Regions:
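Short, well-ordered alpha-helices that flank and scaffold nucleotide-derived cofactor binding pockets
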Residues: 76, 80, 114, 118, ...
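A short, structure-level motif marking secondary-structure boundaries and short turns
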Residues: 59-60, 219-222, 255
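Short, basic/glycine-rich phosphate-binding loops at helix/coil junctions
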Residues: 50-64, 112, 207-217
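Glycine/serine-rich anion-binding loops at beta->alpha junctions
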Residues: 91-120, 138, 245-260
Length: 288
């Protein structure tokens, strides 16, 4: 029997631009992706067996633990691709908010790819894992890479960039559910009046210029979500009024995050948001 434990880190989009809708229904995007210190923990156990079987357990009852789960799908895809056998059991401790725009499912999926490779001693590169990962989700290749990156194409074309300078990141998930599909269907990329300065952000990251990064934070999907869910804009404004360098929505939402230079200021802002909006999923994190 072999056992392995991995942490799977949340991500936010420091910038998110949508360039066009493709004929295959996906959208070409241009994003800056950053990992945060908020993470799920996955413990994998493999026992010998003649065929591949997968069992998944989670500490949160609302998380599906069957073939719908991306962890399950990743192990099954690895098994099919590399002809693996054995009974794989996974224990998931879930801390990243679900359906939050923070790649919680994708990062767990990436952890499953990495763990399966290690447990079975497979001579498989990260690039090969990323090619498999994109079959399961556009954010999965980034989560396999797990470094600050410029993300293009549908999210699978990745270029490592300098990480976000030291700061504190307050993350707040409103108690609303946002459909990514609905957001993209209601976005008219060709009619957008403004686009994020992604190239400028890459330069600011290279220079370690936190204020330069913050001033370029922008997410074009907010043009859809803030009209439907005003609380997203309200939380952004509360973060800014509470000392954030800037605050935007991550991914397709509804999570909002803000950058702070001081831990005490970040913690005070987090507590204010918990109290003012009655939210339980509010965290003070750091880039990682």
């Amino acid at each position: 029997m072999k056992t392995l434990t991995r942490n799977a880190y949340a991500k936010v989009n420091l910038a998110l631009d949508v360039l066009r809708r493709r004929e295959d229904g996906y959208h070409d995007v241009c994003m800056i992706m950053q990992n945060l210190s908020l993470y799920d923990t996955l413990t994998f156990t493999v026992e010998e067996a003649d065929t591949l079987t997968i069992a998944l357990a989670c500490d949160k009852a609302f998380v599906p633990c069957d073939a719908r789960n991306l962890i399950y799908k990743a192990i099954a895809l690895m098994g099919e691709t590399y002809h693996l056998t054995g009974h794989v059991h996974v224990e998931l401790v879930k801390r990243i908010p679900v359906e939050a725009g923070m790649a919680g499912g994708s990062t767990d999926c990436a952890a499953a790819f990495h763990a399966t490779r290690e447990l079975y001693g497979l001579d498989v590169s990260d690039q090969e894992l990323m090619k498999l990962g994109v079959k399961l989700g556009a954010d999965v290749p980034y989560c396999i890479m797990a470094k600050t990156a410029l993300s293009e194409g549908i999210g699978e074309v990745l270029t490592e960039v300098a990480p976000l300078p030291d700061c504190f990141v307050v993350v707040a998930k409103p108690t609303i559910s946002v459909s990514t599909k609905m957001v993209y269907e209601n976005l008219h990329a060709n009619e957008l009046q403004h686009h994020p300065d992604v190239a400028g952000m890459v330069d600011a990251l290279k220079q370690g210029d936190l204020s330069g990064v913050a001033s370029r934070m922008e997410n074009v999907l907010e043009t859809v979500t803030t009209k439907l869910y005003p609380q997203i804009e309200e939380i952004k404004q509360t973060m800014k009024e509470s000392g954030a360098e800037n605050a935007i929505m991550s991914g397709s939402g509804p999570t909002v995050f803000g950058l702070y230079t001081e831990k005490a200021t970040a913690e005070q802002a987090a507590e204010k948001i918990r109290q003012q909006y009655g939210l339980s999923e509010v965290y003070v994190t750091q880039p990682c």
